[in-house]
From Swiss-Prot:
Inhibits various C1 cysteine proteases including cathepsin L, papain and cathepsin B. This protein has no toxic activity and its function in the venom is unknown. It may play a role as a housekeeping or regulatory protein. Residues 1-26 form the signal peptide. Its main location: secreted. Residues 29-129 form the Cystatin domain. Expressed by the venom gland at an extremely low level (at protein level). One of its GO terms (molecular function) is cysteine-type endopeptidase inhibitor activity. This is Cystatin. Disulfide bonds join 91-107, 120-140. The lineage of its organism: Eukaryota, Metazoa, Chordata, Craniata, Vertebrata. It comes from Oxyuranus microlepidotus (Inland taipan). GO terms for cellular component: extracellular exosome. It is found in: Secreted. Belongs to the cystatin family. The record marks 29 as: Reactive site. SUPFAM superfamilies: Cystatin/monellin.
Length: 141
């Protein structure tokens, strides 16, 4: 009796193909690197800066210098893990309407000797179908 090699070869090829996939694509909810220039990352970063300034008790606004690293995770929506550098500006927080991101980015920086730079780690949860973003974690030093 002759046995065909076809039934064994097909599953073996499938297994080999799966092993060659990047690990993040194999694990549902795995964290993957993202480009810092990705529009969704940029939007999450803008939101993080806006929220940082709203929650901070500092008398001056901080603006985004750069996104150092970005990662994302597919959850019920997307969670963005951002490492960013922020710099204290000369724009004082005053009573009334708070500044929006684009206004903050236009704020002048103090002279070099007086500059305060922070490295911050943010987690932003985005649910676009609800038009909602939430800052779930924030730490700066």
């Amino acid at each position: 009796m002759v046995h065909s090699q076809l039934p064994v070869a097909a599953p073996l090829r499938l297994l080999c193909a799966l092993l060659l996939l990047p690990s993040a694509t194999m694990i549902p909810g795995g964290i993957s690197p993202r480009s810092v220039t990705d529009p969704d990352v940029q939007k999450a970063a803008e939101f993080a800066v806006q929220e940082y300034n709203a929650l901070s008790t500092n008398a001056y606004y901080y603006k985004q210098l750069r996104i150092v690293e970005a990662q994302s995770q597919v959850v019920a929506g997307a969670k963005y893990y951002l490492t960013m550098e922020l710099m204290k500006t000369k724009c004082a927080k005053t009573t009334g309407k708070p500044k929006v991101y684009k206004e903050i980015q236009n704020c002048e920086l103090p002279p070099k000797a007086q500059q305060e730079k922070l490295t911050c780690h943010f987690q932003v949860w985005s649910r676009p179908w609800l038009e909602k973003m939430e800052l779930t974690k924030m730490s700066c030093n």
